[in-house]
Amino acid sequence: MIQPQTHLNVADNSGARELMCIRIIGASNRRYAHIGDVIVAVIKEAIPNMPLERSEVVRAVIVRTCKELKRDNGIIIRYDDNAAVVIDQEGNPKGTRIFGAIARELRELNFTKIVSLAPEVL
């Protein structure tokens, strides 16, 4: 579960290393975001000489959470970290590579470009 003020790792090579969630896109007063939700975040740590800089406000989609994800078939998936991928207004990733495993639920939410770049889909 991701809420405002939560720090997340960045799972792509867009230039950001760490994000902090500011807002959850969707309803006006949504408390928590889960895998596949789009958030508004600020970059807290960035790689030097890259397009994205520190204190820049971006949109990101959550790809991994420490909180368990329960599927309809009874499988429970839990990751070691909270991670997101920086996206543009159309929902395409700003980076060209994705690091780490991502959940299959992103394919159902029409983030097919992120799924195709990922090395492993669970």
From Swiss-Prot:
SMART domains membership: Ribosomal_L14 (SM01374)
Gene Ontology molecular functions: large ribosomal subunit rRNA binding; structural constituent of ribosome
Pfam families: Ribosomal_L14
NCBIfam families for the chain: rplN_bact
Quaternary data: Part of the 50S ribosomal subunit.
Major place of residence: plastid
HAMAP family listed in its UniProt record: Ribosomal_uL14 (MF_01367)
Described purpose of this protein according to its UniProt entry: Binds to 23S rRNA.
GO biological process: translation
UniProt keywords, alphabetically: Chloroplast, Plastid, Ribonucleoprotein, Ribosomal protein, RNA-binding, rRNA-binding
GO CC annotations, alphabetized: chloroplast; cytosolic large ribosomal subunit
SUPFAM superfamilies reported in the protein's UniProt record: Ribosomal protein L14 (SSF50193)
Similarity field: Belongs to the universal ribosomal protein uL14 family.
Subcellular location(s) of the protein: Plastid, Chloroplast
Name used for this protein in its record: Large ribosomal subunit protein uL14c
